[in-house]
Amino acid sequence: MKHYSIQPANLEFNAEGTPVSRDFDDVYFSNDNGLEETRYVFLGGNHLEARFPEHPHPLFVVAESGFGTGLNFLTLWQAFDQFREAHPQAQLQRLHFISFEKFPLTRADLALAHQHWPELAPWAEQLQAQWPLPLPGCHRLLLDEGHVTLDLWFGDINELTSQLDDSLNQKVDAWFLDGFAPAKNPDMWTQNLFNAMARLARPGSTLATFTSAGFVRRGLQEAGFTMQKRKGFGRKREMLCGVMEQTLPFPCSTPWFNRMGSNKQEAAIIGGGIASALLSLALLRRGWQVTLYCADEAPALGASGNRQGALYPLLSKHDEALNRFFSNAFTFARRFYDLLPVKFDHDWCGVTQLGWDEKSQHKIAQMLSMDLPAELAVAVEANAVEQITGVATNCSGITYPQGGWLCPAELTRNVLELAQQQGLQIHYQHQLQDLSRKDDGWLLNFAGDQHATHSVVVLANGHQISGFSQTSSLPVYSVAGQVSHIPTTPELAKLKQVLCYDGYLTPQNPANQHHCIGASYHRGSEETAYSDEDQQQNRQRLIDCFPQVQWAKEVDVSGKEARCGVRCATRDHLPMVGNVPDYDATLVEYASLAEKKDEAVSAPVYDDLFMFAALGSRGLCSAPLCAEILAAQMSEEPIPMDASTLAALNPNRLWVRKLLKGKAVKAG
């Protein structure tokens, strides 16, 4: 059985207050002066002070083996802050730090370790505030108002580097080869790791490490680095430094899922919901010029327009990609929303998913068997449900303590307003009818004989995504649904958490004293007219799931207050994020893919045409991380997701999976 929780570091603090690993019998940093050693070995060994002002790109990427207490990262962040203050006009504006950690510290131990370096407190406190849950995979932390990005990969570095997507090849400008000493932790210091470092290293990239062990030097040379010895720090005689002086060939391991970016930095986004809003912010942070075209007269009039939506992860014992994506998307979303400098109604009150029948009870039992961190999800017995939710249900279930609800409409509107302050241009009442290649860009034809040309286009227009010749074959479908708005009652007012059953019920929004209950589900429909039948069904599902409780029967839908919307979904419940695939070319190029994988060319896609769609019913959870993934891909930057999970988000995945098995593919 796959476990979804990472073992925390087993450590103690010695007489000097230095953290010491019990498992490896080694200190996390020098008892003498760990801060100065970091500056000497890693910053000095990679010549970063001299390189920053001369760096020809807006982003500098550092990768590290062994995050530990974060001392190297915090020291580098401090130096980068000082560089930016001294060189405000420099080309280099953002720092990206990638680090791997098999046994992450707890937040409490991290804070204790950071007490050693009071001068790093301004940066350490930001790191502690965003410290992620012990879940496997990549955790992206956006720090210093987006000037610093930290990708924390939790797990074994030798396993993780083999799972990295090809988009990370040759992206790293400097390597910090750190960790417990080779004699203490030989499993980390392998030729596989050295080869992975070379694969990720940009030509001209450097590396530095505290050790001078011969097998480390020879292994790095074998991987392709030019190595030399340098005087070690303090009492250490020698250390190693290296340079990647050659351009090594690294063939794409899964070309059918290859992701193409763009160097054009100017884009049009089609849409007006949460996907468009969050992607706009992510691209603007990377220096893009962004124009948004919305078919409606205002934002969030489609699927993103609800008053309240639940935020919690979608988990399944039998789908690893689903678990990896949604658990990390959920924790990223919480960090992202908490730091977002806009106001929107929300309450992180928790979400409880209830087992109202045998099937749902079995599903919850399977989720609980996955060894999830208690901070993510925890079992709750029937007699405790009333205590934590405020209402009786006579059901047991699973609680997501960090979940809750937010107002999608308000979030979308205010994020777009923030993006406009940062340079976003918005055009409302622009219904895109078709698009075609023109010169080196895209010609957009809107209703009313309006036209525009843009270098790059992103389709983020929900269920209307398949309305163009380039996207008409996508295997997505529409789902119409109605959310009922119900007035609170004395009993309903006691509800303290979002309840999920064969539907959902939110606590009241103090702004309007109403609850949301929903939603009806009509696959293949785009109907947005109010339905009395749907209104009654929303109420009846609640009663059917909790037949023994009186408060459910008191729910009043007679006011006919509701909102109808249409979602875009896929049969595997995962979003579609990436290049728009060329359906006809895919069938031609991959006709013999099952027999000729070794001869496969890169996935056929439309150049500079991207999509961000099929968020289904979990867009509040998935949209922030998907926006970050797509913006990173478009900007040719490191993507915060492993290769197999990224493949599960690729818009061509449902076709390619069949072609890899030699099965026929049909459109839609």
From Swiss-Prot:
Residues 1-245 are annotated as: tRNA (mnm(5)s(2)U34)-methyltransferase. This is tRNA 5-methylaminomethyl-2-thiouridine biosynthesis bifunctional protein MnmC. It is found in: Cytoplasm. Its cofactor is FAD. Keywords: Cytoplasm, FAD, Flavoprotein, Methyltransferase, Multifunctional enzyme, Oxidoreductase, S-adenosyl-L-methionine, Transferase, tRNA processing. The keyword Transferase applies. GO terms for molecular function: flavin adenine dinucleotide binding; oxidoreductase activity, acting on the CH-NH group of donors; tRNA (5-methylaminomethyl-2-thiouridylate)(34)-methyltransferase activity. The lineage of its organism: Bacteria, Pseudomonadati, Pseudomonadota, Gammaproteobacteria, Enterobacterales. It catalyses: 5-aminomethyl-2-thiouridine(34) in tRNA + S-adenosyl-L-methionine = 5-methylaminomethyl-2-thiouridine(34) in tRNA + S-adenosyl-L-homocysteine + H(+). Pfam families: DAO, Methyltransf_30. In the N-terminal section; belongs to the methyltransferase superfamily. tRNA (mnm(5)s(2)U34)-methyltransferase family. Its EC number is 2.1.1.61, 1.5.-.-.
